[in-house]
Amino acid sequence: MTAIAPVITIDGPSGAGKGTLCKAMAEALQWHLLDSGAIYRVLALAALHHHVDVTSEDALVPLASHLDVRFVSTNGNLEVILEGEDVSGEIRTQEVANAASQVAAFPRVREALLRRQRAFRDAPGLIADGRDMGTVVFPDAPVKIFLDASSEERAHRRMLQLQEKGFSVNFERLLAEIKERDDRDRNRAVAPLVPAADALVLDSTRLSIEQVIEKALQYARQKLALA
């Protein structure tokens, strides 16, 4: 009997540093990577490429079931590969974002994408980045980490990111948006943003990203008995 590949789930709110941590862990362990937050955007882009109606659940389900997507982390950069093509930039357009919100509203599409996400589980292992990876998608994962940070710290990090890109931002507005999103995510009826009962809750508020990576890798290696 073939042993099932291990999964490390990294859940947490927006701006906690999940993406950076997941890329670093995938590279350190040489494991596969799943960015669940990008899945709906990738499906939306595939629908646009193949002229599939994003308002038709019946048309979207088969596309979701056979979505040809890979995530590759190289030197800290995440490449999103759809049907052999790097679409990392294309999935960030407003057109794709709008289409993604439409496709995400269909229950059967969500179910098809849930199965598709579980199919990423492959040897030697998978790092799964999301909001309900440890509670819904991979409830049997041997290592679960919930990465958190104060709303103020996450707003500060987001402000710096936007300023580096040349945007003028208002800290108070950013903070209000983050608090509103937190409240929505934590109180929604389906798959609320909460740590799994068996997850390590790692608060990154006062930690550097290097310290977060070190703590997460140390915990994962202990749990999995990796060298």
UniProtKB/Swiss-Prot annotation:
<keyword id="KW-0418">Kinase</keyword>
<dbReference type="GO" id="GO:0036430">
    <property type="term" value="F:CMP kinase activity"/>
</dbReference>
<dbReference type="InterPro" id="IPR003136">
    <property type="entry name" value="Cytidylate_kin"/>
</dbReference>
<keyword id="KW-0963">Cytoplasm</keyword>
<dbReference type="GO" id="GO:0036431">
    <property type="term" value="F:dCMP kinase activity"/>
</dbReference>
<dbReference type="GO" id="GO:0015949">
    <property type="term" value="P:nucleobase-containing small molecule interconversion"/>
</dbReference>
<dbReference type="InterPro" id="IPR011994">
    <property type="entry name" value="Cytidylate_kinase_dom"/>
</dbReference>
<dbReference type="Pfam" id="PF02224">
    <property type="entry name" value="Cytidylate_kin"/>
</dbReference>
<dbReference type="GO" id="GO:0006220">
    <property type="term" value="P:pyrimidine nucleotide metabolic process"/>
</dbReference>
<dbReference type="InterPro" id="IPR027417">
    <property type="entry name" value="P-loop_NTPase"/>
</dbReference>
<keyword id="KW-0067">ATP-binding</keyword>
<keyword id="KW-0547">Nucleotide-binding</keyword>
<keyword id="KW-0808">Transferase</keyword>
<dbReference type="GO" id="GO:0005829">
    <property type="term" value="C:cytosol"/>
</dbReference>
<comment type="similarity">
    <text>Belongs to the cytidylate kinase family. Type 1 subfamily.</text>
</comment>
<protein>
    <recommendedName>
        <fullName>Cytidylate kinase</fullName>
        <ecNumber>2.7.4.25</ecNumber>
    </recommendedName>
</protein>
<dbReference type="GO" id="GO:0005524">
    <property type="term" value="F:ATP binding"/>
</dbReference>
<feature type="binding site">
    <location>
        <begin position="12"/>
        <end position="20"/>
    </location>
    <ligand>
        <name>ATP</name>
    </ligand>
</feature>
